[in-house]
Amino acid sequence: MTRFVVTGTDTGIGKTIFSASLARATGTPYWKPVQSGLEEETDSEIVARLAGVPVRPEAYRLVTPASPHIAAEIDGVAIDIERLTPPPGELIVEGAGGALVPVTRRTLYAELFARWQVPVIVCARTSLGTINHSLLTIEALKRRDVPIHGVVFIGDAVEDSEAIIADVSGVRRLGRLPVVAPLTSENLAAAFGANFDIADFR
């Protein structure tokens, strides 16, 4: 069954694009529990456009483009973490920013992942600094007993960095999604098919 949480080592690294590629390849519904910032195309809208799969409505749509805990406070919204529990069945759940981003003043995303016990896919850059960021993220998840399905790299190939992260962490490499340009549904599907084994996500 395709049921994963997609998190990352930082914000803006390509989690949504990878989520869209995985959702399209597997035909799996997508859910972003908390969306912060509504002025531009939202992550759910991007996935709907690129993947063509069912997209569940966000539990919280926050106007302010910031970390959920701050955005909620500015918007006057109290986030109830019980509303963020993923529903049963096949689903791709995307977090916000990195794994240690606060959802509320008391709860980090990694702590939600530990509660959910849904296997996590860690998205990481291939650019300079990714070794430290990736190993810290994986270590933080492991310390909280979060099940880690594997790591996905996004960007140009940097073989040594990708290999050392997998070797040191003991987490398997699932593949690398290159920069897709122009970013169309067809091009994204081709990139996923050329760089990942769909059996790793079933």
From Swiss-Prot:
Mg(2+) binds at residues 16, 43, 94. It is an enzyme of class 6 (ligase). Pathway: Cofactor biosynthesis; biotin biosynthesis; biotin from 7,8-diaminononanoate: step 1/2. It comes from the Bacteria. Its EC number is 6.3.3.3. InterPro entries: DTB_synth_BioD, P-loop_NTPase. One of its GO terms (molecular function) is dethiobiotin synthase activity. ATP binds at residues 12-17, 43, 94-97, 178-180. GO terms for cellular component: cytosol. It is found in: Cytoplasm. The keyword Cytoplasm applies. The active site is at residue 32. Keywords: ATP-binding, Biotin biosynthesis, Cytoplasm, Ligase, Magnesium, Metal-binding, Nucleotide-binding. Substrate binds at residue 36. The keyword Cytoplasm applies. One of its GO terms (biological process) is biotin biosynthetic process. NCBIfam families: bioD. HAMAP family: BioD. Catalyzes a mechanistically unusual reaction, the ATP-dependent insertion of CO2 between the N7 and N8 nitrogen atoms of 7,8-diaminopelargonic acid (DAPA, also called 7,8-diammoniononanoate) to form a ureido ring. Belongs to the dethiobiotin synthetase family. This is ATP-dependent dethiobiotin synthetase BioD. It comes from Sphingopyxis alaskensis (strain DSM 13593 / LMG 18877 / RB2256) (Sphingomonas alaskensis). The lineage of its organism: Bacteria, Pseudomonadati, Pseudomonadota, Alphaproteobacteria, Sphingomonadales. The gene is bioD.
